[in-house]
């Protein structure tokens, strides 16, 4: 019987990546970020280990959606009390908390387990172009989510 080699935990050193969300499609951006957080881009990916990297997303306020999703996509939350349902459109949530839009999209693409919650903590999202993680020397990760666009 063949067994898949499991990398030792001390060899799993995470890297830091910087992703610019300006003029990127929300869903396609979230797919790439989720893959980086899980570590699926690495040759030593192991599903039950945290092999992922840290991802810094800047310019969250400039992420776009296509079609009528700007006014028709709804975000719901509930306070737990009777009648406590709050509903916001994409445009309202992006104006109020632009980071939350990307966080919710990426969180839905990660495993809904303890490991997924741990990987989600490696996501850092900022509304503007500045972030406090210069000391980690993040590498710019080029991302192109517009199909057919010339790069």
Curated annotation (Swiss-Prot):
Origin organism lineage: Bacteria, Bacillati, Cyanobacteriota, Cyanophyceae, Synechococcales
The name this protein goes by in its record: Large ribosomal subunit protein uL13
Disulfide bridge positions per record: none
Keyword Ribonucleoprotein: yes
Superkingdom field: Bacteria
The protein's assembly and partners: Part of the 50S ribosomal subunit.
Task performed by this protein: This protein is one of the early assembly proteins of the 50S ribosomal subunit, although it is not seen to bind rRNA by itself. It is important during the early stages of 50S assembly.
Assigned GO CC terms: cytosolic large ribosomal subunit
GO molecular function: mRNA binding; structural constituent of ribosome
PANTHER family: LARGE RIBOSOMAL SUBUNIT PROTEIN UL13M, RIBOSOMAL PROTEIN L13
GO BP term, example: negative regulation of translation
Family of this protein: Belongs to the universal ribosomal protein uL13 family.
Alphabetical keyword list: Ribonucleoprotein, Ribosomal protein
InterPro entries, per database record: Ribosomal_uL13, Ribosomal_uL13_bac-type, Ribosomal_uL13_CS, Ribosomal_uL13_sf
Presence of keyword Membrane: no
């Amino acid at each position: 019987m063949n067994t898949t080699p499991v990398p030792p935990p001390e060899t799993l050193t995470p890297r830091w990546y910087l992703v610019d969300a300006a003029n990127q499609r929300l869903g396609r951006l979230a797919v790439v970020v989720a893959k980086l957080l899980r570590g699926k881009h690495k040759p030593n990916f192991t599903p039950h280990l945290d092999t992922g990297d840290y991802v810094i997303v800047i310019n969250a306020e400039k992420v776009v959606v296509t079609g009528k999703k700007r006014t028709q996509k709804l975000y719901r939350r509930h306070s737990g009390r009777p009648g406590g349902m709050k509903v916001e459109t994409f445009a309202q949530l992006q104006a109020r908390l632009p980071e939350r839009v990307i966080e919710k999209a990426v969180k839905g693409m990660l495993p809904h387990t303890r490991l997924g919650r741990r990987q989600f903590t490696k996501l850092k999202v900022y509304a503007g172009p500045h972030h406090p993680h210069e000391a980690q020397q993040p590498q710019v990760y080029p991302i192109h989510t517009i199909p057919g666009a010339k790069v």
